[in-house]
């Protein structure tokens, strides 16, 4: 069964997952490092600081995810890495690291669209969620209403024009004197 190392650095969280299998994939390990403490003083994500946090976190996150999954670098068949949308500097860290691992190990490299990743993640927890369906994607700077006709075939029904829902939560929380990020305190 193929072993996949997944990397995500689109905004302020650095994460790595190790999956095995085809069809019904099994997550062997998943690890996320948050950089919210870095951004809290500013009341929101500062792109340059997010990129720097990824630089210091990406290697330990990937190493620990592989170690916890009892997988060595040589066992990785494919590296799947978020290729966008997201913060340019943050994406560069993840894509560069993913390319280096793929090149060094001879593994395949697959770019993953951040929002499509959210759609697919739904099927991990809800295997009965099969297209066609309509999805509301709310992730950081994105709020989209998507018609999922089949996997890989989507039609955008609507999106916000300015602030996404996540940004609105953070701004309202700041006005109310609540901590960053604002989603949980407001909920």
Regions found by a protein language model. Give the residues of each.
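Conserved phosphate-binding catalytic cores of ATP/NTP-utilizing and phosphoryl-transfer enzymes
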Residues: 1, 111-134
């Amino acid at each position: 069964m193929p072993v996949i190392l997944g990397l995500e650095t689109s905004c302020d969280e650095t994460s790595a997952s190790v999956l095995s299998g085809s069809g019904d994939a099994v997550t062997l390990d998943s690890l996320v490092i948050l950089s919210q403490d870095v951004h809290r003083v500013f009341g929101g994500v500062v792109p340059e600081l997010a990129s720097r946090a990824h630089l210091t976190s990406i290697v330990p996150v990937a190493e620990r995810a592989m170690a916890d999954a009892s997988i060595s670098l040589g066992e990785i068949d494919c590296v799947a890495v978020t290729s966008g949308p997201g913060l340019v500097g943050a994406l560069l860290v993840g894509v560069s690291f993913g390319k280096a691992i793929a090149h060094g190990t001879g593994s395949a490299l697959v770019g993953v669209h951040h929002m499509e990743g959210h759609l697919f993640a739904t099927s991990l927890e809800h295997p009965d969620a099969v297209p066609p369906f309509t999805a509301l994607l709310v992730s950081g700077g994105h709020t989209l209403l998507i018609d999922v006709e089949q996997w890989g075939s989507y039609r955008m029904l609507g999106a916000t024009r300015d602030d996404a829902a996540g940004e609105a939560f953070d701004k309202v929380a700041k006005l109310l004197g609540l901590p960053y990020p604002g989603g949980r305190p407001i909920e």
